């Protein structure tokens, strides 16, 4: 290797290491704070290693009794989040796989125009849609229920449609033609040929839906009124005292428990995730 190439590679690696440490520091601070006594959470200068490791903060987070809101039903929030996330993931995979297939492999009048309009919806900021969407769901009588949070997933999302459409286009059309010669219809071709080959892209769409729903705060904040219907991200607000005295170590322990499923899912599915992202833009 030439000296300048070696120097450039070393510089890039050092920059990547520094950025990785910078991104990891907040997570490390959250983990260490979740194990600290309450007196060490706000010390100056900050104390990274707790003098005493308190694993008891995690049971306290699960069975927390808030001064303002009373007992915090962590398990109820967890069940609500799991149910809601499951519905959104199912709706996302079901609807977007069908729409993406139509845009990628079927020919019909106005296909490219409709696809362009679908992509254009990604340019609309969420705050612009927030008020009219809330008015629509209020007119339907859905405010205060989970339906505004999961029903839209069954009508497709522009990003997942684009992702799946791009992946479908990488699958050889000769496979579909051969299946048609054997008497297969479009739906059977979709189920038995395209879907098995598109598992990496479908997994990516499911992962994005999972992470987006699990971490969603604004949606539940707008539509959920009863504390018994709160999700985990919204329920974390109950750990904060409005009059001072927030137990930050308990709050950080609860936050660690909330993000743990997302970290585990991404850790075990990262190979498929990267494969789906990398192969969706080949063609």
Which positions does each model-derived feature cover?
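A structural signal for multi-pass alpha-helical bundles of membrane permease subunits
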Residues: 4, 8-283
């Amino acid at each position: 290797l030439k000296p300048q190439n070696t120097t450039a590679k070393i510089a890039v690696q050092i920059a990547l290491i520094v950025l990785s440490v910078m991104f990891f520091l907040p997570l490390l601070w959250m983990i260490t704070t979740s194990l600290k006594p309450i007196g060490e959470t706000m010390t100056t200068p900050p104390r990274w290693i707790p003098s005493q490791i308190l694993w008891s903060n995690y049971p306290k987070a699960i069975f927390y009794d808030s001064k303002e809101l009373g007992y915090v039903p962590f398990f109820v929030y967890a069940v609500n989040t799991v149910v809601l996330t499951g519905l959104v993931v199912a709706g996302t995979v079901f609807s977007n796989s069908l729409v993406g297939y139509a845009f990628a492999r079927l020919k019909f009048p106005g296909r490219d125009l409709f696809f362009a309009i679908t992509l254009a919806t990604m340019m609309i900021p969420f705050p612009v849609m927030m008020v009219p969407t809330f008015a629509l769901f209020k007119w339907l009588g859905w405010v205060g229920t989970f339906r505004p949070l999961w029903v839209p997933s069954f009508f497709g999302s522009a990003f997942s449609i684009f992702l799946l459409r791009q992946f479908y286009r990488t699958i050889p059309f000769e496979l579909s033609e051969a299946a048609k010669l054997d008497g297969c219809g479009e739906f059977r071709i979709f189920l038995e040929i395209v879907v098995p080959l598109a598992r990496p892209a479908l997994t990516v769409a499911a992962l994005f839906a999972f992470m987006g729903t699990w971490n969603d705060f604004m949606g539940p904040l707008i539509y959920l009124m009863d504390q018994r219907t709160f999700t985990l991200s919204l329920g974390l607000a109950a750990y904060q005292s409005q009059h001072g005295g927030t137990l930050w170590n308990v709050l950080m322990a609860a936050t660690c428990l909330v993000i743990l499923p997302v970290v585990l899912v991404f850790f075990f599915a990262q190979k498929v995730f990267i494969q789906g992202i990398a192969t969706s833009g080949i063609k």
